[in-house]
Amino acid sequence: IDIIGDTRSKIIFQHCPYLGIFYEKDKKLGLAGIYSLLMNIRKTHYELAVDLRSDGLLYFIKAKKKLFKHSNQSTLNLHSAERHFLAIKKVTNAPIPNPKIWISEKERLFSKKVLGKQKNILALGLGANFDGKIWPVSNFVDLADSLSGFFEAVLLLGSHQDAKKSSIFMKLYSGKVIDCAGQTNLLETAALLGKSKFFVGNDSGLGHMASAVGIPSFTIFGVGEPNRYRPLGKEALWYQDPGFNISIIKGAHIAAKIIQWI
């Protein structure tokens, strides 16, 4: 299977057993970059090509059969994954599989080195890509305090932008903390999540990664549409304030829901 994606997502497919060629689409290269990308892709005549981006590239790809994704307007009642799988319904009625990230022994050894003998780890994702999606750090601290009897250590994950939040968290929280925010790539992050007992975070990619490595998670939504964009899986819990004000959600309230689950 050949895939077109951006540079950030490439590493996720690094160990995928089905991957043929990963074509990077770099928006910074402009029209020249798109032209070069198309020239490379058009060297292959595909049996099937599927559009999940609506960026027009599918019209220029050589393929015996082309399938386009359904519009947002026609699928407002569906989860985003269900919407995307509708694109291939004409060729398969197979159920939507559980999300998965392929991790190698290298990443597994990395996670063992970082975590050592620590078990019962609570992983936290303190950041997101928009302020309206970010739960205050102090609320995460209250959550961790409320759950301290269930977990031996807190693992902080996220991007370089989240490192400042990690520093604040460590000043406020008195328990054991392993800070990896801004220090790992996506596969290393996935491996660390796989060694954790539970993940709690904002509406960000980390919640989806938690589902993809098979651990239970709790996503705290501010603005956003959890019915469409929550992590997939029976063990993926979520909560959203009715008024979409994430800051007023109490740490103890989320902790109580998690304790009922675990």
What residues fall within each predicted segment?
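Catalytic machinery of carbohydrate-active enzymes
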Residues: 1-262
